[in-house]
UniProtKB/Swiss-Prot annotation:
The keyword Cytoplasm does not apply. One of its GO terms (cellular component) is ribosome. Residues 56-75 are annotated as: Disordered. InterPro entries: Ribosomal_uL4, Ribosomal_uL4-like, Ribosomal_uL4_dom_sf. GO terms for molecular function: rRNA binding; structural constituent of ribosome. One of the primary rRNA binding proteins, this protein initially binds near the 5'-end of the 23S rRNA. It is important during the early stages of 50S assembly. It makes multiple contacts with different domains of the 23S rRNA in the assembled 50S subunit and ribosome. It holds the Pfam family Ribosomal_L4. Belongs to the universal ribosomal protein uL4 family. This is Large ribosomal subunit protein uL4.
Length: 207
């Protein structure tokens, strides 16, 4: 399956053969894409939320007043959950939110996400993801030729430092090395730009 290779100026500079089993799956499985995104987002959660229980709250263990004769409801501790400044009952605890997902499904998610972008003609192969200067204005001018609102750029083994610095001030533009290709960022950005090195890596990784 042949497709165009473009320059950053959106000019055709050649052709590349893509593996249709990775970049052009016939039936897009949105359910698999959603499963992988849920897995990614759950894994990214810190899970460091925590409230103190009765046994962890600082304070005295002395009974606040005698059991009988005050007219008040009986109380055993100032740290009880019903007291101001007391412990929290059934509050959140530090835990991992990560869920298990088979590696095969994670691979399929990436394949179907790439295929979806290709079907929408929003997956583009770029001949070179390098800039002479780390100037945001230069990159904004180049990306404007693609008429997109957001870009997920997947470079080769190493990201060009000038390109990376130039993206810092551009809203909704992200560049990652080839190992950083992921379903969530592919789906949430309008355009996906791949270097030729990234294409080779993904075909090797997902075959």
């Amino acid at each position: 399956m042949k497709t165009k290779i473009l320059s950053l100026a959106n000019e055709e500079v050649g052709e590349i053969t893509l593996n249709k089993d990775i970049f052009a799956v016939e039936f897009i499985r949105d359910d698999i894409i959603k499963q992988v995104i849920d897995w990614q987002r759950a894994k990214a959660m810190f899970g460091n939320h925590k409230t103190k229980t009765v046994s962890e709250v600082s304070g005295t263990t002395k009974k606040p007043f005698k059991q009988k004769g005050t007219g008040n409801a009986r109380q055993g501790s100032l740290r009880s959950v019903q007291m101001r400044g007391g412990g929290i009952s059934h509050g959140p605890k530090v835990r991992s939110h990560a869920i298990k997902l088979p590696k095969k499904v994670r691979k399929l998610g990436l394949i179907h996400a790439l295929s979806e972008k290709y079907a929408e003609e929003k997956l583009l192969i770029i001949d070179s993801l390098k800039l002479d200067k780390p100037k945001t204005s230069i990159l904004v001018n180049l990306l404007s030729k693609f008429q997109g609102q957001s870009f997920f750029v997947i470079d080769g083994n190493k990201v060009d430092i000038n390109f990376s610095l130039a993206t810092k001030n551009i809203y909704n533009t992200l560049i990652v090395p080839q190992i950083g290709a992921n379903v969530y960022d592919i789906i949430r950005h309008e355009y996906v730009l791949l270097s030729q090195e990234a294409v080779s890596f993904l075909e090797e990784r997902l075959r």
